[in-house]
Amino acid sequence: MEGITSFENLPEELKREILLRMSPNSLVTCSRVSKKLASMIRTKSFKELYLSRSMRCPRVLFAANGTITPHVLFTSFQEKEKPLLSSGEQRIITSLQGEFLFSPPVRGLICLVERESARIVICNPGTTKFLALPIVEADETTRIITHLGYDEQKDVFKVLCTRTKPETPHLVLTVGSGKEPWREIVCKFPHTVIGAGVFYRGTLYYLAAFHSKSIIMTFDVRSETFMPITSPDGVDLNQGSWRLVNYSQQGGFALVNESRGFIYQSNGGDAYLETWVWNVDTRKWSMNSILIRKWKDYAQDNEDYDYRFRGTQGTYELVFAPIRVKEDGSLTVILYNTDTQAFRRSKVQMMGEGHEFRFVDTFLDHVDSTLLI
Protein backbone atom coordinates (compact mmCIF):
# COMPACT_ATOMS: atom_id res chain seq x y z
CA MET A 1 0.00 0.00 0.00
CA GLU A 2 1.37 3.39 -1.01
CA GLY A 3 2.34 5.83 1.71
CA ILE A 4 3.19 3.15 4.28
CA THR A 5 6.81 2.85 5.40
CA SER A 6 8.03 -0.15 7.37
CA PHE A 7 9.83 0.41 10.64
CA GLU A 8 13.03 -1.06 9.19
CA ASN A 9 13.08 1.63 6.50
CA LEU A 10 12.86 4.56 8.89
CA PRO A 11 15.94 6.74 9.50
CA GLU A 12 18.25 5.39 12.20
CA GLU A 13 17.73 8.38 14.49
CA LEU A 14 13.94 8.03 14.27
CA LYS A 15 14.09 4.30 15.01
CA ARG A 16 16.34 5.03 17.97
CA GLU A 17 13.94 7.65 19.34
CA ILE A 18 10.97 5.28 19.03
CA LEU A 19 12.86 2.51 20.82
CA LEU A 20 13.84 4.89 23.61
CA ARG A 21 10.15 5.46 24.33
CA MET A 22 9.31 1.76 24.61
CA SER A 23 8.96 -0.24 27.81
CA PRO A 24 11.71 -2.78 28.60
CA ASN A 25 9.34 -5.67 27.85
CA SER A 26 8.56 -4.20 24.42
CA LEU A 27 12.28 -3.91 23.72
CA VAL A 28 12.62 -7.62 24.48
CA THR A 29 9.99 -8.34 21.83
CA CYS A 30 11.77 -6.10 19.31
CA SER A 31 15.08 -7.83 19.94
CA ARG A 32 13.45 -11.21 19.28
CA VAL A 33 11.88 -10.30 15.93
CA SER A 34 14.75 -8.26 14.47
CA LYS A 35 18.50 -8.87 14.66
CA LYS A 36 19.14 -5.28 13.57
CA LEU A 37 16.99 -3.87 16.36
CA ALA A 38 18.56 -6.27 18.85
CA SER A 39 21.99 -5.02 17.83
CA MET A 40 20.90 -1.40 18.34
CA ILE A 41 19.24 -2.08 21.71
CA ARG A 42 22.33 -3.85 23.06
CA THR A 43 24.81 -1.10 22.23
CA LYS A 44 26.39 0.67 25.19
CA SER A 45 25.30 4.09 23.94
CA PHE A 46 21.64 3.04 23.71
CA LYS A 47 21.71 1.43 27.17
CA GLU A 48 23.20 4.55 28.74
CA LEU A 49 20.75 6.92 27.04
CA TYR A 50 17.75 4.73 27.91
CA LEU A 51 18.83 4.56 31.55
CA SER A 52 19.55 8.29 31.69
CA ARG A 53 16.05 9.14 30.45
CA SER A 54 14.48 6.67 32.84
CA MET A 55 16.30 8.19 35.81
CA ARG A 56 14.52 11.48 35.19
CA CYS A 57 11.19 9.77 35.89
CA PRO A 58 11.77 7.08 38.55
CA ARG A 59 9.12 4.49 39.30
CA VAL A 60 7.60 2.99 42.44
CA LEU A 61 8.20 -0.78 42.34
CA PHE A 62 6.15 -3.41 44.16
CA ALA A 63 7.41 -6.98 44.60
CA ALA A 64 5.39 -9.92 45.91
CA ASN A 65 5.43 -13.70 46.18
CA GLY A 66 2.35 -15.64 45.17
CA THR A 67 0.76 -17.40 48.15
CA ILE A 68 -1.25 -19.85 46.04
CA THR A 69 0.98 -20.29 43.00
CA PRO A 70 4.73 -19.97 43.73
CA HIS A 71 5.90 -17.24 41.40
CA VAL A 72 7.28 -13.71 41.68
CA LEU A 73 5.21 -10.69 40.66
CA PHE A 74 6.44 -7.17 39.94
CA THR A 75 4.24 -4.11 39.45
CA SER A 76 5.46 -0.55 38.99
CA PHE A 77 3.98 2.83 38.20
CA GLN A 78 5.31 6.24 37.24
CA GLU A 79 3.85 9.35 38.81
CA LYS A 80 5.82 12.27 37.46
CA GLU A 81 4.63 12.55 33.88
CA LYS A 82 1.80 11.37 31.70
CA PRO A 83 2.59 7.95 30.25
CA LEU A 84 4.57 7.51 27.07
CA LEU A 85 5.14 4.01 25.74
CA SER A 86 7.53 3.15 28.56
CA SER A 87 5.55 4.87 31.31
CA GLY A 88 2.32 4.15 33.10
CA GLU A 89 1.64 1.01 35.10
CA GLN A 90 3.61 -2.14 34.33
CA ARG A 91 2.56 -5.57 35.65
CA ILE A 92 4.91 -8.49 35.19
CA ILE A 93 4.68 -12.12 36.34
CA THR A 94 8.08 -13.78 36.12
CA SER A 95 8.94 -17.42 35.50
CA LEU A 96 10.81 -17.54 38.82
CA GLN A 97 9.33 -20.34 40.91
CA GLY A 98 9.62 -20.24 44.70
CA GLU A 99 9.35 -17.84 47.62
CA PHE A 100 11.94 -15.08 47.42
CA LEU A 101 13.35 -12.29 49.57
CA PHE A 102 13.92 -8.98 47.77
CA SER A 103 16.70 -6.45 48.15
CA PRO A 104 16.18 -2.84 46.97
CA PRO A 105 16.63 -2.30 43.21
CA VAL A 106 19.68 -0.50 41.84
CA ARG A 107 19.78 1.05 38.35
CA GLY A 108 16.97 -1.16 37.08
CA LEU A 109 18.09 -4.49 38.58
CA ILE A 110 17.00 -6.29 41.74
CA CYS A 111 18.58 -9.18 43.66
CA LEU A 112 16.44 -12.04 44.99
CA VAL A 113 17.17 -14.95 47.34
CA GLU A 114 14.93 -18.01 47.52
CA ARG A 115 14.08 -18.88 51.11
CA GLU A 116 14.34 -22.68 50.92
CA SER A 117 17.14 -23.36 48.44
CA ALA A 118 19.12 -20.12 48.96
CA ARG A 119 19.14 -19.68 45.18
CA ILE A 120 20.33 -16.16 44.28
CA VAL A 121 19.32 -14.39 41.07
CA ILE A 122 19.66 -10.93 39.54
CA CYS A 123 16.45 -9.85 37.80
CA ASN A 124 15.32 -7.01 35.56
CA PRO A 125 11.66 -6.55 36.61
CA GLY A 126 10.77 -4.74 33.40
CA THR A 127 11.91 -7.56 31.12
CA THR A 128 11.45 -10.60 33.45
CA LYS A 129 14.96 -11.64 32.42
CA PHE A 130 17.16 -12.98 35.21
CA LEU A 131 20.69 -14.17 35.80
CA ALA A 132 21.36 -17.05 38.19
CA LEU A 133 24.38 -16.61 40.46
CA PRO A 134 26.55 -19.42 41.89
CA ILE A 135 25.11 -21.29 44.86
CA VAL A 136 26.20 -20.16 48.33
CA GLU A 137 26.59 -22.96 50.85
CA ALA A 138 24.34 -22.67 53.90
CA ASP A 139 22.64 -25.15 56.23
CA GLU A 140 18.94 -25.12 57.13
CA THR A 141 19.51 -22.93 60.19
CA THR A 142 21.38 -20.24 58.26
CA ARG A 143 19.66 -17.40 56.47
CA ILE A 144 21.26 -15.71 53.47
CA ILE A 145 20.84 -11.96 52.93
CA THR A 146 22.04 -10.13 49.83
CA HIS A 147 22.50 -6.48 48.92
CA LEU A 148 22.97 -5.18 45.38
CA GLY A 149 25.31 -2.26 44.72
CA TYR A 150 26.96 -0.47 41.83
CA ASP A 151 30.56 0.67 41.33
CA GLU A 152 30.23 3.73 39.09
CA GLN A 153 33.97 4.09 38.54
CA LYS A 154 34.34 0.58 37.08
CA ASP A 155 30.75 0.42 35.74
CA VAL A 156 29.99 -2.92 37.42
CA PHE A 157 27.32 -4.28 39.74
CA LYS A 158 28.35 -6.14 42.87
CA VAL A 159 26.40 -8.37 45.24
CA LEU A 160 27.25 -8.49 48.94
CA CYS A 161 26.22 -11.81 50.48
CA THR A 162 26.09 -12.38 54.23
CA ARG A 163 24.94 -15.32 56.32
CA THR A 164 23.31 -15.12 59.73
CA LYS A 165 26.04 -17.15 61.42
CA PRO A 166 28.78 -14.74 62.62
CA GLU A 167 31.59 -17.20 61.95
CA THR A 168 30.84 -17.39 58.22
CA PRO A 169 32.81 -14.96 56.01
CA HIS A 170 31.20 -12.23 53.95
CA LEU A 171 31.13 -12.81 50.20
CA VAL A 172 31.19 -10.46 47.21
CA LEU A 173 30.47 -11.20 43.56
CA THR A 174 31.06 -8.91 40.59
CA VAL A 175 28.10 -9.40 38.27
CA GLY A 176 28.95 -10.48 34.73
CA SER A 177 27.98 -13.55 32.74
CA GLY A 178 26.85 -15.50 35.79
CA LYS A 179 30.01 -17.62 35.96
CA GLU A 180 31.97 -15.24 38.20
CA PRO A 181 32.87 -16.79 41.58
CA TRP A 182 32.05 -15.51 45.04
CA ARG A 183 35.04 -13.94 46.79
CA GLU A 184 35.63 -13.90 50.54
CA ILE A 185 36.40 -10.44 51.92
CA VAL A 186 37.92 -9.33 55.19
CA CYS A 187 35.73 -7.49 57.68
CA LYS A 188 37.29 -5.80 60.72
CA PHE A 189 33.87 -5.51 62.35
CA PRO A 190 32.38 -9.03 62.68
CA HIS A 191 28.62 -8.69 62.36
CA THR A 192 25.45 -10.31 61.10
CA VAL A 193 22.97 -8.53 58.87
CA ILE A 194 19.51 -7.95 60.35
CA GLY A 195 17.68 -6.94 57.18
CA ALA A 196 17.59 -5.04 53.91
CA GLY A 197 19.09 -1.58 53.69
CA VAL A 198 19.58 1.18 51.14
CA PHE A 199 22.14 1.94 48.44
CA TYR A 200 23.23 5.55 48.09
CA ARG A 201 26.17 7.13 46.23
CA GLY A 202 28.23 3.98 45.95
CA THR A 203 27.66 2.77 49.51
CA LEU A 204 25.36 0.17 51.04
CA TYR A 205 23.80 1.00 54.42
CA TYR A 206 22.06 -1.69 56.49
CA LEU A 207 21.16 -2.66 60.04
CA ALA A 208 23.42 -5.24 61.64
CA ALA A 209 24.15 -6.96 64.95
CA PHE A 210 27.62 -6.30 66.40
CA HIS A 211 28.57 -7.78 69.79
CA SER A 212 24.86 -8.31 70.65
CA LYS A 213 24.13 -4.68 69.80
CA SER A 214 22.24 -3.34 66.79
CA ILE A 215 24.23 -0.91 64.66
CA ILE A 216 24.22 0.64 61.19
CA MET A 217 26.91 -0.84 58.96
CA THR A 218 28.20 0.62 55.70
CA PHE A 219 29.85 -1.19 52.80
CA ASP A 220 31.78 0.79 50.20
CA VAL A 221 31.08 -1.06 46.95
CA ARG A 222 34.20 0.19 45.16
CA SER A 223 36.79 -0.49 47.89
CA GLU A 224 34.83 -3.43 49.40
CA THR A 225 35.38 -2.18 52.95
CA PHE A 226 33.07 -2.05 55.97
CA MET A 227 32.61 0.78 58.46
CA PRO A 228 29.96 1.22 61.20
CA ILE A 229 27.97 4.41 61.75
CA THR A 230 27.15 5.67 65.23
CA SER A 231 23.41 5.65 65.86
CA PRO A 232 21.60 8.92 66.72
CA ASP A 233 21.93 10.21 70.27
CA GLY A 234 19.32 8.64 72.51
CA VAL A 235 18.29 6.00 69.96
CA ASP A 236 18.58 2.34 70.99
CA LEU A 237 18.37 0.23 67.84
CA ASN A 238 17.83 -2.85 70.02
CA GLN A 239 14.46 -1.43 71.05
CA GLY A 240 11.74 -1.41 68.39
CA SER A 241 11.73 -2.36 64.73
CA TRP A 242 13.96 0.06 62.85
CA ARG A 243 14.16 0.42 59.09
CA LEU A 244 16.29 2.43 56.66
CA VAL A 245 14.57 4.26 53.79
CA ASN A 246 15.77 6.59 51.04
CA TYR A 247 15.33 10.24 51.96
CA SER A 248 16.48 12.50 49.12
CA GLN A 249 15.12 15.70 50.69
CA GLN A 250 18.22 16.11 52.83
CA GLY A 251 20.77 14.20 50.77
CA GLY A 252 20.82 10.83 52.48
CA PHE A 253 18.61 8.22 54.11
CA ALA A 254 16.24 8.10 57.05
CA LEU A 255 15.88 5.83 60.05
CA VAL A 256 12.32 5.07 61.17
CA ASN A 257 10.89 2.95 63.97
CA GLU A 258 8.12 0.83 62.45
CA SER A 259 7.13 -0.83 65.72
CA ARG A 260 5.77 2.51 66.96
CA GLY A 261 3.92 3.14 63.72
CA PHE A 262 5.88 6.42 63.40
CA ILE A 263 2.59 8.16 62.62
CA TYR A 264 1.58 9.99 65.77
CA GLN A 265 -2.12 10.83 65.85
CA SER A 266 -3.15 14.14 67.37
CA ASN A 267 -6.49 15.88 67.84
CA GLY A 268 -8.25 16.91 64.65
CA GLY A 269 -6.88 14.08 62.52
CA ASP A 270 -3.39 15.55 62.09
CA ALA A 271 -0.29 13.38 62.48
CA TYR A 272 3.47 13.67 62.83
CA LEU A 273 6.06 11.69 60.94
CA GLU A 274 9.25 11.40 62.96
CA THR A 275 12.50 10.25 61.37
CA TRP A 276 16.22 10.44 61.97
CA VAL A 277 17.92 11.63 58.77
CA TRP A 278 21.57 10.88 57.94
CA ASN A 279 23.28 13.42 55.70
CA VAL A 280 26.03 11.65 53.76
CA ASP A 281 27.91 14.91 53.14
CA THR A 282 28.05 16.20 56.72
CA ARG A 283 27.94 12.68 58.21
CA LYS A 284 25.53 13.87 60.87
CA TRP A 285 22.11 12.81 62.14
CA SER A 286 19.22 15.25 62.43
CA MET A 287 15.80 14.71 63.96
CA ASN A 288 13.00 15.44 61.50
CA SER A 289 9.38 15.86 62.60
CA ILE A 290 6.89 16.62 59.82
CA LEU A 291 3.32 17.68 60.52
CA ILE A 292 0.90 15.95 58.14
CA ARG A 293 -2.42 17.75 58.09
CA LYS A 294 -5.65 15.71 58.11
CA TRP A 295 -3.84 12.37 57.80
CA LYS A 296 -6.58 10.45 59.59
CA ASP A 297 -9.29 11.91 57.36
CA TYR A 298 -7.38 11.14 54.17
CA ALA A 299 -6.11 7.66 55.06
CA GLN A 300 -9.60 6.36 55.78
CA ASP A 301 -8.58 2.70 55.56
CA ASN A 302 -5.42 3.18 57.61
CA GLU A 303 -6.66 0.92 60.42
CA ASP A 304 -7.32 -2.02 58.12
CA TYR A 305 -4.28 -1.54 55.90
CA ASP A 306 -1.44 -0.18 57.99
CA TYR A 307 0.53 2.38 55.98
CA ARG A 308 4.31 2.51 56.34
CA PHE A 309 6.63 5.32 55.38
CA ARG A 310 8.77 4.14 52.46
CA GLY A 311 10.84 7.26 51.79
CA THR A 312 10.72 10.24 49.48
CA GLN A 313 9.85 10.35 45.79
CA GLY A 314 11.52 13.34 44.18
CA THR A 315 12.13 16.40 46.33
CA TYR A 316 8.92 17.04 48.23
CA GLU A 317 6.74 13.93 48.26
CA LEU A 318 6.58 11.45 51.12
CA VAL A 319 5.45 7.97 50.07
CA PHE A 320 3.30 5.74 52.28
CA ALA A 321 2.36 2.19 51.26
CA PRO A 322 0.64 -0.77 52.97
CA ILE A 323 2.51 -3.97 53.70
CA ARG A 324 -0.25 -6.14 52.22
CA VAL A 325 -2.81 -5.91 49.46
CA LYS A 326 -6.58 -5.84 49.75
CA GLU A 327 -8.80 -8.82 49.04
CA ASP A 328 -9.33 -7.71 45.45
CA GLY A 329 -5.57 -7.84 44.88
CA SER A 330 -5.07 -4.07 44.85
CA LEU A 331 -3.22 -1.61 47.05
CA THR A 332 -3.34 2.15 47.43
CA VAL A 333 -0.23 4.32 47.76
CA ILE A 334 -0.49 7.71 49.45
CA LEU A 335 1.84 10.54 48.45
CA TYR A 336 2.08 13.70 50.57
CA ASN A 337 3.69 16.89 49.26
CA THR A 338 5.44 18.62 52.16
CA ASP A 339 5.64 21.89 50.23
CA THR A 340 1.97 22.23 49.23
CA GLN A 341 0.58 19.97 52.02
CA ALA A 342 -1.45 18.15 49.36
CA PHE A 343 -2.29 14.43 49.23
CA ARG A 344 -2.48 12.15 46.22
CA ARG A 345 -3.61 8.55 45.92
CA SER A 346 -2.46 5.95 43.40
CA LYS A 347 -4.30 2.64 43.25
CA VAL A 348 -2.32 -0.28 41.85
CA GLN A 349 -3.75 -3.64 40.81
CA MET A 350 -1.43 -6.47 41.80
CA MET A 351 -3.05 -9.00 39.42
CA GLY A 352 -4.33 -11.33 42.10
CA GLU A 353 -7.67 -11.96 43.78
CA GLY A 354 -8.42 -12.92 47.34
CA HIS A 355 -5.22 -13.63 49.23
CA GLU A 356 -3.14 -14.69 46.24
CA PHE A 357 -0.63 -11.88 46.86
CA ARG A 358 -0.85 -11.15 50.54
CA PHE A 359 2.32 -9.24 51.42
CA VAL A 360 4.18 -6.78 49.24
CA ASP A 361 7.50 -4.91 49.37
CA THR A 362 7.59 -1.31 48.11
CA PHE A 363 10.71 0.26 46.61
CA LEU A 364 11.21 3.83 45.40
CA ASP A 365 13.44 5.28 42.68
CA HIS A 366 13.28 2.17 40.49
CA VAL A 367 14.18 2.83 36.86
CA ASP A 368 13.59 1.07 33.55
CA SER A 369 16.70 -0.57 32.14
CA THR A 370 17.78 -2.57 29.09
CA LEU A 371 20.20 -4.71 31.11
CA LEU A 372 19.91 -8.50 30.69
CA ILE A 373 18.11 -8.12 27.33
Curated annotation (Swiss-Prot):
Domain F-box per the UniProt entry, residue ranges: 4-49
Cross-referenced SUPFAM superfamilies: F-box domain (SSF81383)
InterPro entries cross-referenced by the UniProt entry: F-box-assoc_dom_typ3 (IPR013187), F-box-assoc_interact_dom (IPR017451), F-box-like_dom_sf (IPR036047), F-box_dom (IPR001810)
Domain of life (superkingdom): Eukaryota
Matches recorded under PANTHER family: BNAA05G37150D PROTEIN-RELATED (PTHR31111), F-BOX ASSOCIATED DOMAIN-CONTAINING PROTEIN (PTHR31111:SF138)
Record's protein name: Putative F-box protein At1g76830
Protein source organism: Arabidopsis thaliana
